[in-house]
């Protein structure tokens, strides 16, 4: 009788341990798959999105600069949007109107630097043509590190760093 109780206890304990171990392994494999799919999705989506977003953020005409920049605000995370708006109101808009600046931006290359399920960084190669009231165009090539953050189902620009 004692032997049977001991065997039942050991069998039950082992069953619980096996169940917990298999559940943990299954959860780990599931989460790893979620992470990998999120990374693959970011690598597939963000190069095209960055090529589309960056000209919207950097291109403007002095006559419509407020409208152009306002159209770019939804592309930014709420935190970066506040910083970008402060910079736009303090520097970009007044300078654009004063010097009658027209900026055209073209993305010539994009590469993913790092990608995770909810955040990624891309390198953007951008050519800009800046024309002011002197009507003498200035051509400028830039490299930008663009950090993206996924909020809900949407990738938004979290920060732009010139390199």
Residue ranges: model-predicted function:
Residues 20, 26-27, 33, 45, ...:
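Short leucine-rich amphipathic alpha-helices used at interfaces
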Residues 38-41, 45, 136, 140:
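Short alpha-helix boundary/capping segments
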Residues 1-36:
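Amphipathic, hydrophobic N-terminal targeting peptides for secretion and organelle import
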Residues 17-25, 43-45, 93-94, 120:
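Short, flexible segments with low predicted structural confidence
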Residues 41-97:
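Core segments of small alpha/beta cavity-forming domains
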């Amino acid at each position: 009788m004692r032997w049977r109780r001991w065997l039942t206890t050991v069998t039950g304990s082992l069953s619980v341990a096996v169940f917990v171990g298999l559940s943990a392994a299954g959860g780990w494999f599931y989460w790893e798959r979620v992470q990998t799919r999120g990374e693959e999705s970011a690598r597939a989506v963000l190069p095209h999105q960055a090529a589309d977003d960056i000209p919207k953020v950097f291109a403007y005409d002095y006559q419509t600069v407020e409208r152009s920049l306002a159209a770019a605000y939804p592309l930014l995370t709420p935190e970066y949007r506040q910083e970008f708006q402060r910079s736009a109101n303090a520097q970009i808009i007044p300078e654009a109107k004063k010097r009658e600046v027209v900026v055209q931006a073209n993305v010539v290359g994009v590469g993913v630097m790092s990608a995770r399920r909810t955040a990624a960084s891309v390198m953007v190669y951008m050519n800009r043509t800046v024309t002011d009231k002197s009507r003498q165009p200035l051509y400028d090539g830039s490299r930008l590190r663009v950090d993206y953050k996924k909020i809900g189902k949407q990738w938004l620009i979290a920060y732009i760093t010139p390199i």
